[in-house]
Amino acid sequence: MPENISHDSETPAQEQQVITACAFIHHNFDGIEKVFLPKRADTKKFLPGVYELPGGHIDYGEDIIKGLKREIMEEFGMKATIGDPFATFTYLNKIKGSHSIEVIYFAKFDDSLENIVIHPEDHSRFEWIAENELGKAYTEYKRGDDPEMQAVKKGFSLLKGELLAFN
């Protein structure tokens, strides 16, 4: 990577489409389903200090599931089982100059939750957040109407077996 670029999310991709895979990693804590939401480091140029679903860019020619597993291992030192995709959305990344297509999958950690590692250049911390606590994850950059937060709400609805509306 060029010297002035510290992370792939800053690598220029002017007018290119980028595939991003993310995981709705959930766990049941004493009967309460929660989602794993790491908080991006404040030093990030794109969405600093924002809670997000774990994942990242899929490399050229890489299988999307293998790429998502790779991202989870790189960022948190954890193996994960990836389930079905349940949400997609697109956004423009003004830092990279790219058009991102995000695909969100259900997932579970395979390793003990005590083994989660946080790399400070990527994330400052993480939370396990229940559906009724999602307001804790909102920031000036990411509110309840944000597409990723809408996908998190959808994930909780699907876990509860609720039927979804169609557009």
Regions picked out by a protein language model, each given a short descriptive name:
Residues 21-23, 85, 103-107:
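A structural signal for short, well-ordered beta-strand segments
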Residues 32-74:
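Conserved Nudix-box catalytic region and its N-terminal flanking loop in Nudix hydrolases
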Residues 120-167:
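Nudix hydrolase/Nudix homology domain
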Residues 78-87:
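A short coil-to-beta-strand element that immediately follows conserved catalytic motifs
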Residues 1-30:
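Acidic, metal-coordinating catalytic segment for phosphate/diphosphate chemistry
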Residues 18, 48-53, 98-102:
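Short connector loops at helix/strand junctions that flank enzyme active sites
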Residues 89-115, 127:
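Active-site-adjacent beta-strand/loop module that shapes the phosphate/pyrophosphate-binding cleft
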